[in-house]
Amino acid sequence: MTLRNFKWRNLYLWLVFIVLYAPIIFLVVYSFSQGTTMNNFHGFTWQHYQDLFADSRLIAIFLDTILIALLSSLLATVIGTLGALGINSTTKPITRNTLLSLNNILMVSPDVIIGASFLIFFTALKIPLGFGSVLLSHIAFSIPIVVLMVLPKIQEMSTSLLDAAADLGANNWQLLSQIIVPYIMPGIFSGFFMALTYSLDDFAVTFFVTGNGFSTLSVEIYSRPVKVSTWKSTPCPV
């Protein structure tokens, strides 16, 4: 009975991996096809990759996307870690629950609503849309992710560690830098990489706040097929 259950679990695990990775493998394989569609493989070619690396605009957009992701993730990690420490330090349950609820608003809100809200906010404050607006938006929706990653690690930490360090003469800065931060570092790294992933993956929020002359990789990838399909569907003048 145990062997049978083990085999079924392995089969289920393999099915999950196939569902997750088969589309990616499919895209990679057909990226080497000479054809322009993904119906049939028309022969091996490097042409698509040559065109990709020859596209200076796309390379610049890729670098901007990486820069946005790294900056927003780093700043969101710092702010989110401080926020998690602040939430954990509150003594009143009502205050703590209120702060957690406010933190989770961006997590449960639809991306379209968040993007439209940021657009209205930046327009009202006359903040130009571009690199700065995208960076601020990515920081804002990444902070709750970092808080949710760091806060459980803080709550796991025993207060006896802090009490012992304080009894040995450690000040507040030493408690933070030498005890708290090293202990919660796994949560900080998890929050950073989660924020980095969300920033690289985001499309809906970024689409609203990019403005003219600036784009990220996800927005560019979406807009190019739209432009091609629009051009093909436009009737020729007679």
Residue ranges and their predicted role:
Residues 3, 36, 48-57, 200-238:
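Interhelical loop and adjacent transmembrane-helix boundary motif
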Residues 1-5, 71-103, 120:
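Transmembrane-helix boundary motif in ABC transporter permease subunits
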Residues 2-4, 67, 91-100, 157-190:
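Amphipathic cytosolic juxtamembrane alpha-helices at the membrane-cytosol interface
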Residues 59, 63, 67-79, 83, ...:
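Hydrophobic alpha-helical transmembrane segments of multipass integral membrane proteins
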Residues 22-25, 29, 78-82, 116, ...:
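Membrane-embedded alpha-helices of multi-pass transport/permease systems
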Residues 46, 112-141, 173, 209-212:
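Membrane-interfacial helix termini and adjacent extracytoplasmic/periplasmic loops
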Residues 1-56, 60-63, 67:
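N-terminal, non-cleaved signal-anchor transmembrane helix
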Residues 11-12, 17-24, 147-150, 157-159, ...:
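Transmembrane alpha-helices
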